[in-house]
């Protein structure tokens, strides 16, 4: 088949992407992976195939755009296109994290609460990941607007996060390592989508030592640099439940070093109106000793789901999206970006250059794109 034919074929695969009409059983997600024509590492797609419509988010070395295929007849079909400049990735020592992100997302397709990697590709200067677009925006925005969530909203979103952690840990041995409201989007139906797998890593039952994450959500063992594993995600879930109900994380200060001190001390202070079951699950999830932490042992997600805080959750109904999302975003059309912040245009001045020397050393590491 000629290169042009491959190009047209891969564009058609991208155009054909549809969310499954209903969530798959977690085991089918894994079993059917090889049958899927998603997560393709394309040698034929190019940035010139897309129209970049609006910036959805920015980071230190990446920018996410709302994008559309130029020759697509369905004008409502849009995607989130993550663009990472190779030179910036190298300068900021993020090569391993970027590779882990693509590897992790490629292993996961059709999970109801995880963003879908449709395709990846690269060119001389940049790496690209084409993802599904979640028009609801960050759950962070809704939390700040409401100041705090009520107990039922907090419970449902915590349950969806719990099932996501369960899947990553028990099926793939992946530690997500960056759980926070900014990395949780809402789809049009008000259900979560976990995004940004830049710190995700397959650790299984081993320990890793990379210091990564956001200060308020770091587990004590990460701060101690004593080796950490899957248990860090259960700690972060406890922090999130607290933040959903109270409006701010339990450990916070203007000075990050003071945040670290508070986390290591581990003294949780609960407002008097916080429900007892919520206080208890946060206390169990935020044990400073990871071996004592709820969810720590193999299959420990079952113990998390069995906690009284989740007593009213119908787990299958929630997973298969038979339960209505507690917050329904205002979305007027499929390409609506009204739930996202405005971002300035990217500054192309003083950009790092992907030199021939860098290319010789690092290009083999980007081959999976």
What is each residue range found by the language model?
Residues 63-86:
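Glycine-rich ATP phosphate-binding loop
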Residues 120:
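Activation-segment/catalytic-loop signature of the eukaryotic protein kinase fold
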Residues 53-64:
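Protein kinase glycine-rich loop
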Residues 157-158:
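Activation segment signature within eukaryotic-like protein kinase domains
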Residues 115, 124-132, 140-141:
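A conserved loop-to-beta-strand element in the N-lobe of protein kinase catalytic cores
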Residues 1-44:
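Intrinsically disordered, low-complexity regulatory segments that flank or precede the catalytic domain
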């Amino acid at each position: 088949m000629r290169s042009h034919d491959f190009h047209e074929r891969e564009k058609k695969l991208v155009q054909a992407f549809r969310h499954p009409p209903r969530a798959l059983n977690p085991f089918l997600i894994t079993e059917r992976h090889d049958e899927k024509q998603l997560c393709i590492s394309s040698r034929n797609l190019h940035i010139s195939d897309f129209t970049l419509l609006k910036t959805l988010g920015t980071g230190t070395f990446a920018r996410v755009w709302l994008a559309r295929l130029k020759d697509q007849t369905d004008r409502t079909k849009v995607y989130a296109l993550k663009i990472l400049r190779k030179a910036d990735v190298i300068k900021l020592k993020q090569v391993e994290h970027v590779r882990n992100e693509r590897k992790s997302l490629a292993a996961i397709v059709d999970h109801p609460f995880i963003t879908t990697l449709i395709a990846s590709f690269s060119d001389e200067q940049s790496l690209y990941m084409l993802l599904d677009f979640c028009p609801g925006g960050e759950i962070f925005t809704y939390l700040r607007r409401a100041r705090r969530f009520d107990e039922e909203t907090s419970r449902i979103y915590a349950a969806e996060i719990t099932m996501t952690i369960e899947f990553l840990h028990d099926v793939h041995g992946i530690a997500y390592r960056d759980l926070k409201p900014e990395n949780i989007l809402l789809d049009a139906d008000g259900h979560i989508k976990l995004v940004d797998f830049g710190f995700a890593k397959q650790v299984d039952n081993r320990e890793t030592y990379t210091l990564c994450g956001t200060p308020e959500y770091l587990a004590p063992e990460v701060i101690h640099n004593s080796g950490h594993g899957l248990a860090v995600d259960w700690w972060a879930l406890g922090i999130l439940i607290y933040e959903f109900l109270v409006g701010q994380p339990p450990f916070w200060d203007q000075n990050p070093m003071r945040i670290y001190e508070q986390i290591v001390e581990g003294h949780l202070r609960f407002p008097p109106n916080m429900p007892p079951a919520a206080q208890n699950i946060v206390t169990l999830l935020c044990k400073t000793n990871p071996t004592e932490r709820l969810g720590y042992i193999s299959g420990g997600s079952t113990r998390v789901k069995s906690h009284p805080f989740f007593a009213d959750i119908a787990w299958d109904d929630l997973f298969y999206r038979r339960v209505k999302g507690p917050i329904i975003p205002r979305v007027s059309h499929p390409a609506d970006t009204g739930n996202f912040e405005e971002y300035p245009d990217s500054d192309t001045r003083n950009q790092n250059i992907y030199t021939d020397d860098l290319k010789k050393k690092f290009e083999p590491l980007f081959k999976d794109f």
